[in-house]
Amino acid sequence: MTKIHKGVYVTLTTYGARLKSVHSTIRSVLRQSELPEKIILWLDKEEFKKEELPAELSSLTGERFEIHFCENMRSYTKLVPSLLAFPDKSFITIDDDFEYPGDLVEKLMKGAEDFPDAIVCSRGRIIKYQDCDFEPYPNWTLLDRKTEAFANYCILPLGYAGVFYPAGALHSDTCDINSFMSVAPHADDLWFKAMGLLHKTPVAVLPLADSMGMATIDGTQDNALYLTHNAGDGNTEQMRAIVQKYPQLLPFFRSKAYPLITTDFGAQEEINDREKIGEFAASIVNEIRESAIKLESRNIFLSQKLMKLAQKVRPQGSLINAKLAEYEKKIKR
């Protein structure tokens, strides 16, 4: 029997000619090895009418899949209306121009188990911030690792590949349409990242191989967002505008801990080459240790990995070694 993840909704939107092909995206979610409780497609109430929807799409509606109508919020329509309508749910956002691998939901939910309370994405970039400014968006490195990556600050989830947002992961301003339309009208990924940062929600990225089965739907790329508004430095400019509106984000980008990502949980990796890893890891060893302690009631295996990382930096730490001994006893039971 197929596992259903209660309290988890897949949410997306579509527009224009893509309405005729979005059924392919929906079918790919309905065929998942593990299913969400609901799939919600949001449509612009001014552009579309229920009675005019393609039969291939409307025939899919039922217990699992629903179509809702709302105000046009551009790309934000895939998540913001769901946050407003179902505030206690967790969400997986996807795009309307892909057919997704059959285990997308399963992989994201496994990531959510491994990284409790984190935003989990199939693909991500490292936001490059140096010398008090953002580097051009094309320089933000795409993570292409064979293992998961985890970071408190520097990873940008890429919405097109699937992103899991646990309930309560985003700041209360997330649904403020006037704010996001004024500073980042074409960069929902950046806005949601900033809202996660303001709420101090970390990000985990799955191995790149997990999303390699994505397939672009024919004819959907003619007006893709990345080919229009976000070409070149469009994202960089909008990121600057977000930070200008929320200057409380600056301490995150300027933090010594900002450029650290955890990959194999055996070592910290620094995203710039200018300073040694040891200096950065040493500066946040207490944060690593406390994160392990907070997680121990929910995922003792992840706590053990994090505490081993802290031990590499501080091998004589009495609390670290005591906790590792405690974890080993519990795991062997």
Predicted ranges, named:
Residues T25-E37, K45, S59:
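Short, acidic, metal-binding catalytic loop of nucleotide-sugar glycosyltransferases
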Residues K3-K6, S21-S24, S179-I277:
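C-terminal catalytic/acceptor-binding lobe
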Residues M1-R31:
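N-proximal low-complexity "stem/linker" segments adjacent to membrane-targeting elements
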Residues K89-E99:
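Short beta-strand-to-loop acidic/aromatic patch adjacent to the donor-nucleotide binding site
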Residues E99-S179:
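Conserved catalytic core of nucleotide-sugar-dependent glycosyltransferases
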Residues W42-K89:
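Active-site-proximal specificity loops/subdomain of glycosyltransferases
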